[in-house]
């Protein structure tokens, strides 16, 4: 790895030593900062026939770090006196999901989760926009490292404004950005290959589940018409009925920030459901709840409301006893049939329901809606066999998905490391 000839102390532990000829400036002197906001949802004039992109975290997750099109648009009436965020400026997530950034390709706005960063005109010939785009990966990490974990995490604006930007000459910045463009594109391509592999494996998994819960395990069984388009034919001896007859559905706990404690009863939220399993990396606790809202082994926890339609309907099976409840944007399904079979049945039903009726506009599932979704129901003696079969099949597919995700994680770590080394001068990529 090629290095610079001479280094100096940057004065900041999180940056370390930098090339002797490089400069540094605080972010407050580099950028103009503005906060994003959400226009009132109650005023239709702000939203109907809007043409101005209004970005949320979902846009970065689904589109990437260079934003042009948006999932939602607002009208000129919704724009406050400060005007739009300029094309060529950046947005940085400073609340909730800390440390994600994107370049704005067009004049636009973003919600209050983001802070807009615009390089000052006086520095336009000193600091390259393309170089700063990559330096924001370093700032992303700085924001994550300096923000305390809490229910509603937020970056300290004072710390952010005093964050230092280190940089070489404008000419070298341009060369560094070009180098990173090339190498990051190669890494992103490898990541994309693994992501496509995961998508295919997830499709295979859902196909295996759907076939088992609608056709059973006996390929020679006599079939009959179900009368439900998405179900198709089912074994002749099976029943077709609304979901409400397979168990009970109930809404979750409504709580406020003042109810949150450091330790207590875990509140399961959307972030606690990852890949159809419970995850315990983003936890919130409350001190007490009524007994009827406590989670039990065998329950199925469902995301019933979310700003992202793609997350609505995702579910997880509670496979052990927990000191937990579930939040207001969640529902619980307590099957009165074989419980793991009920989990697979629900996954199939809700997946088909969303795919058949809408793929983008369902942002909530109500008890009334779920109750009336029709499902095929195997005989009691078959339910355990189907659940056991699917446990084995899904475990094999999940292992392949996990391996692909591990490759993605390694590639993303390498990309972050490469960018950090280059924009802080630890690795020299230019010939001058």
How would you name each of these model-derived features?
Residues 40-48, 147-149, 222-226, 256-263, ...:
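Short coil/turn segments at secondary-structure boundaries
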Residues 10-11, 28-43, 58-87, 244-256, ...:
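Sequence-specific dsDNA recognition surfaces
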Residues 56-57, 73-137, 156, 269, ...:
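A short beta-sheet element
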Residues 136-140, 144, 188, 346, ...:
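Short amphipathic alpha-helical signal-transduction/dimerization elements
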Residues 7-37, 49, 63, 162, ...:
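Non-catalytic DNA-recognition/assembly elements of restriction-modification systems
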Residues 7-10, 94, 108-117, 148-174, ...:
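A short glycine-rich beta-alpha junction/loop motif
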Residues 1-15, 21, 167-221, 376-432:
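Amphipathic alpha-helical coiled-coil/heptad-repeat segments
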Residues 35-39, 60, 140-141, 206, ...:
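Generic structural signal for secondary-structure transition and capping sites
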């Amino acid at each position: 790895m090629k290095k610079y000839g001479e280094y100096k102390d940057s004065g900041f532990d999180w940056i370390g030593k930098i090339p002797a000829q490089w400069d540094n400036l605080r972010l407050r002197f580099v950028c103009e900062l503005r906060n994003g906001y959400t226009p009132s949802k109650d005023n239709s004039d702000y939203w109907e026939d809007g043409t101005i992109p209004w970005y949320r975290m979902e846009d970065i997750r689904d589109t990437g770090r260079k934003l042009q099109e948006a999932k939602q648009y607002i009208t000129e009436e919704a724009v406050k006196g400060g005007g739009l965020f300029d094309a060529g400026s950046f947005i940085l997530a400073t609340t909730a999901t800390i440390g994600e950034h994107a370049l704005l390709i067009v004049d636009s706005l973003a919600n209050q989760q983001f802070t807009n960063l615009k390089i000052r005109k006086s520095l336009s010939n000193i600091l390259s926009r393309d170089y700063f785009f990559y330096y924001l990966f370093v700032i992303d990490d700085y924001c994550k490292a300096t923000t305390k974990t809490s229910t509603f995490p937020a970056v300290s604006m004072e710390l952010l404004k005093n964050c230092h930007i280190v940089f070489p000459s404008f000419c070298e910045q341009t060369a560094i950005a070009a180098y990173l463009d090339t190498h990051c594109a190669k890494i992103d391509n490898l990541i994309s290959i693994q992501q496509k592999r995961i998508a295919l494996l997830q499709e295979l998994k859902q196909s295996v589940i759907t076939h088992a819960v609608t056709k059973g395990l006996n390929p020679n069984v006599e079939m009959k018409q179900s009368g439900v388009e998405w179900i198709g034919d089912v074994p002749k001896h099976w029943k077709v009925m609304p979901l409400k007859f397979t168990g009970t559905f109930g809404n979750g706990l409504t709580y406020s920030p003042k109810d949150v404690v450091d330790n207590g009863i875990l509140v399961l939220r959307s972030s606690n459901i990852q890949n159809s399993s419970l995850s315990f990396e983003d936890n919130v606790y409350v001190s007490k709840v009524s007994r009827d809202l406590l989670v039990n082994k065998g329950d199925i926890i469902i995301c019933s409301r979310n700003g992202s339609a793609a997350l609505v309907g995702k579910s997880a099976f509670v496979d052990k006893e927990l000191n937990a409840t579930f939040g207001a944007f969640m529902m619980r399904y307590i099957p009165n049939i074989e419980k793991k079979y009920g989990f697979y049945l629900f996954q199939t039903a809700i997946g088909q329901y969303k795919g058949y009726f809408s793929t983008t506009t369902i942002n909530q599932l109500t008890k009334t809606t779920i109750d009336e979704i029709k499902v095929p129901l195997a005989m009691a003696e078959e339910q355990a066999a189907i659940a056991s079969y699917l446990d084995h099949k899904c475990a094999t597919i999940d292992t392949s998905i996990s391996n692909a995700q591990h490759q993605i994680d390694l590639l993303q770590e390498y990309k972050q490391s490469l960018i950090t080394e280059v924009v802080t001068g630890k690795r020299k990529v230019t010939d001058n």
